[in-house]
Amino acid sequence: MQHEENEIVSKSELLVVTGMSGAGKSLVLQNLEDLGYFCVDNLPPILLPKFVELMEQGNPSLRKVAIAIDLRGQEFFKSLVKEVDLLRSQNRVIVDVMFVEASEAKLISRYKETRRAHPLNDNGQRSLIDAIEEERNSLTEIRSIANYVIDTTVLKPKELRAQINHLFNRNDIETFSISVTSFGFKHGIQQDADLVFDVRFLPNPFYVEALRPLTGVDDEVYQYVMKWQETAIFYDKLLDLLKFMIPGYKKEGKTQLVIAIGCTGGQHRSVALAKRLAEDLNESYDYNVYVHHRDAHIESGVENEKS
């Protein structure tokens, strides 16, 4: 029995995601990508065997693959059940099927909100209700062979994420990460930041000639920035605030929190504080914590640091 389990574990996993248009397949795919799946949207079923051949070549990034297939490719979709049955019978990879659905009323509501055309009604010749009914009837067979059926009628996005995480994060992989970035306001704000802190009120090493060409990574600059009382008070408050906020962000289903610390040029003060913050957060949590000094190299000439 142990031998059989090892054989199963060694196989790559293929998850086919299909279901009703507007039920949330794209969101499911995003959540699976966060769990380490290699995701492909709208692959014609006839290409599934070719994709499995790629998976069998041993590429580590293709150990877990999720492929969304739906009625957008109507002429190809009819072969989906046949292709899935064939792959399952060959037993080359683990093949699962997820079917995502929602009630007619909820689907109608979502289409009205997005103002998008249903894939079976792109010419506007039929009612939305008729298009939904035809699609549901067309998907009866593929639904019958699904391992997982998820009804998103009453699910909020974070609840759907939690359900996907429960089903497919089998190894309890920690998917939450924290990225701490230093930047200079004169070079533009960090666009992807969730939280931005302005430290231009702190004493500036730029005006100390010996420190000017260095960065906050250098010990001389780091010690200069940290020696001031206002820096110590600010940093203690910042760390307390973040330790209060971070669990809440994770609970809400975020997979990455980007914290940006900015000073004038992004070379001295923000770098020193980002460096310390990343170190302290790394000690406090089991999450992956990264530090990135975006602008430190621009005026100092040092290489941009990512860790």
UniProtKB/Swiss-Prot annotation:
InterPro entries hit by this protein: P-loop_NTPase (IPR027417), RapZ-like (IPR005337), RapZ-like_N (IPR053930), RapZ_C (IPR053931)
Keywords, sorted A to Z: ATP-binding, GTP-binding, Nucleotide-binding
UniProt record similarity statement: Belongs to the RapZ-like family.
Origin species: Staphylococcus carnosus (strain TM300)
Nucleotide-binding listed as a keyword: yes
Annotated ATP binding sites: 19-26
A single GO molecular function term of this UniProt record: ATP binding
Binding site for GTP: 70-73
Protein name: Nucleotide-binding protein Sca_0414
Function: Displays ATPase and GTPase activities.
Source lineage: Bacteria, Bacillati, Bacillota, Bacilli, Bacillales
One Pfam family hit: RapZ-like_N
